Amino acid sequence: MTAFRAMTTQPSSGLKSLYNTCITSLINAGIWAKLDALYLMNVETAQAARLNLKNPGTYDLTATSSPTFTAKVGYKGDGSTAYLDTNFNPITASGPKFVQDNASAFVWSLQQTAENNPQLGQAGSGNTIIYGRRTTDTMQGQVNTTSTAAGAASTDGRGLIHANRAVSTTQELFKNGASVGTDAHASNAPISANLAFLRTSVLFSAATIAMGGFGGALTSQNAADLYTALSAFKTGVDAL
């Protein structure tokens, strides 16, 4: 796997096998080709956790203001300044899959409790934001819109939350591979600002996140297959 050459410390044999199985599953499901970035943060070293596995060296994460890394768990924000910058700006990126009416973003949160700060964000006109569980016991996600987010009831913020836009008029929210809500609001052009985990422009999350990524829109079957692949990776890492 190309990403292994970009890792300063090679993963254990067990983790290498899990990487290969996960990425092979995403390729076979037709998901890999649609991604701009995939980050598996619940691994053995912080440097490997920040790699964009789709294209190492491009859109690798920058840990800003010292989010806390825990091996085989992920990265935790502090609720005030710490976050992970994807270094991906949808306006200045070269040939991105993530575009106005064909885009998705996802994050695997390990935080059960509620907070009104998003686990993934890009604030301003053209918002792309994901909340695993707000204090209203709802989860929300929106992609390239300033309008109301797609939402659903949520009393547990843990799991894979995935916001998707395949057309100009509708966005959809998925939890653990299943559709949980749609929202019929028109898209806005993405803004010239980096996507980030654990923050928007002014709000910072204290959650722990294990995985994340973004790219073009995914089908419902893709969403289910993404969850299956990432869940298998997480289960495998938990057992190492």
Per-range role (PLM):
Residues M1-L240:
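Polar, enzyme-active/binding microenvironments
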